[in-house]
């Protein structure tokens, strides 16, 4: 009996998609994997419009993105490119850009928008409801507020909350009742946007935690480091373009002080030395009595 062979044929659209992904991967110096799982279509379109001029975003199947990354790594002789695959999660997409990884992370973070929290979701931070009027008339909503632990009452014909109250701590799972209350109060504790999973540049894949920088804190540390280095350079007399002027000024001041103290007359010290001598003479004369000074002094 002859052996029957079956040939597996790859769908042409998959081949085209992989080739399209490869073009994207080769088009930018910086490639990012991002998570798009929780982004509603309306917000996604807004984000696309915001980032269109600075980066290219493409969604695809994880298996096809993985294949494209592996082929680009092989074709370019750059095996480190495959490190991106380790960052891949369900719902991932690719971004190609010329931005540096830190600026890319900041841009994507700033494109996020507030969103309501869903039942069963984890609170990203302490959720606090401030005291004051809800603007709603008396009705069933009063009981809903009390059911989630809010000190609510009727005030001036409207439902009001008596005091600031934290209804969920960071990490708490939000109940269905609380999610409804927060939605009615138009409180949006969530942020919807593109979350960075990993960014590749020059053989390095950056974890998002590395890219998350407090700019004010970083600037303060940079200024502190500069001041420390500047002082060290001046005190150790290590001339640099930034410190040479201060070093020369300090050396001149020290030399002048020594010259004055040693009564060594120069064009720079003569006035100070004579002034010092005069002051000393007057002090001695004062101790000796008024007759010690002639009329000219």
Curated annotation (Swiss-Prot):
GO BP, sorted A to Z: cytoplasmic translation; ribosomal large subunit assembly
Q: Supply the CDD domains for this chain.
A: Ribosomal_P0_L10e
Xref: InterPro entries: Ribosomal_protein_uL10 (IPR050323), Ribosomal_uL10 (IPR001790), Ribosomal_uL10-like_insert (IPR040637), Ribosomal_uL10-like_insert_sf (IPR043164), Ribosomal_uL10-like_sf (IPR043141), Ribosomal_uL10_arc (IPR022909)
Organism superkingdom: Archaea
GO cellular component assignments: cytosolic large ribosomal subunit
**This protein's UniProt keywords:** Ribonucleoprotein, Ribosomal protein, RNA-binding, rRNA-binding
Q: Which GO terms describe its molecular function?
A: large ribosomal subunit rRNA binding; structural constituent of ribosome
Pfam family membership, one? Ribosomal_L10
Transmembrane segments annotated in the record for this chain: none
Which SUPFAM superfamilies does this chain map to?
Ribosomal protein L10-like
Asked if the record carries the keyword Ribosomal protein, the reply is yes
**Function comment:** Forms part of the ribosomal stalk, playing a central role in the interaction of the ribosome with GTP-bound translation factors.
Output the PANTHER family linked to this UniProt entry: 60S ACIDIC RIBOSOMAL PROTEIN P0, LARGE RIBOSOMAL SUBUNIT PROTEIN UL10
Subunit relationships: Part of the 50S ribosomal subunit. Forms part of the ribosomal stalk which helps the ribosome interact with GTP-bound translation factors. Forms a heptameric L10(L12)2(L12)2(L12)2 complex, where L10 forms an elongated spine to which the L12 dimers bind in a sequential fashion.
Instruction: Give the record's family classification.
Output: Belongs to the universal ribosomal protein uL10 family.
Kindly give the HAMAP family that the UniProt entry links to this protein: Ribosomal_uL10_arch (MF_00280)
Protein name, as recorded: Large ribosomal subunit protein uL10
Question: Which organism does this record belong to?
Answer: Methanococcus voltae
GN (gene name): rpl10
């Amino acid at each position: 009996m002859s052996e029957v062979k079956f040939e597996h044929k790859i769908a042409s659209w998959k081949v085209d998609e992989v080739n399209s992904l490869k073009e994207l991967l080769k088009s930018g110096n910086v490639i990012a994997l991002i998570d798009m799982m929780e982004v509603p279509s309306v917000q996604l379109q807004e984000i696309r419009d915001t980032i269109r001029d600075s980066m290219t975003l493409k969604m695809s199947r994880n298996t096809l993105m993985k294949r494209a990354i592996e082929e680009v790594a092989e074709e370019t002789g750059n095996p480190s490119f495959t490190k991106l695959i380790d960052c891949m999660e369900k719902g991932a997409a690719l971004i190609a850009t010329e931005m540096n990884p830190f600026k890319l992370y900041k841009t994507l973070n700033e494109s996020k928008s507030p969103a309501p929290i869903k039942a069963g979701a984890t609170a990203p931070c302490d959720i606090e409801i401030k005291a004051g009027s809800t603007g709603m008339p008396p009705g069933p909503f009063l009981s809903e507020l009390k059911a989630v632990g809010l000190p609510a009452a009727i005030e001036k014909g409207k439902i009001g909350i008596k005091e600031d109250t934290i209804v969920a701590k960071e990490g708490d799972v939000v109940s269905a009742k609380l999610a409804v209350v927060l939605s009615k109060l138009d409180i949006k504790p969530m942020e919807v946007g593109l979350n960075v999973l990993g960014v590749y540049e020059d053989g390095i894949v950056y974890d998002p935690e590395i890219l998350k920088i407090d700019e004010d804190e970083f600037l303060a540390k940079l200024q502190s480091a500069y001041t420390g280095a500047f002082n060290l350079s001046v005190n150790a007399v290590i001339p640099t373009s930034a410190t040479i002027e201060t070093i020369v000024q300090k050396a001149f001041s020290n030399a002048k002080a020594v010259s004055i103290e040693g009564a060594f007359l120069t064009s720079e010290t003569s006035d100070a030395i004579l002034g010092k001598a005069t002051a000393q003479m007057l002090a001695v004369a004062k101790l000796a009595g008024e007759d010690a000074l002639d009329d000219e002094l």
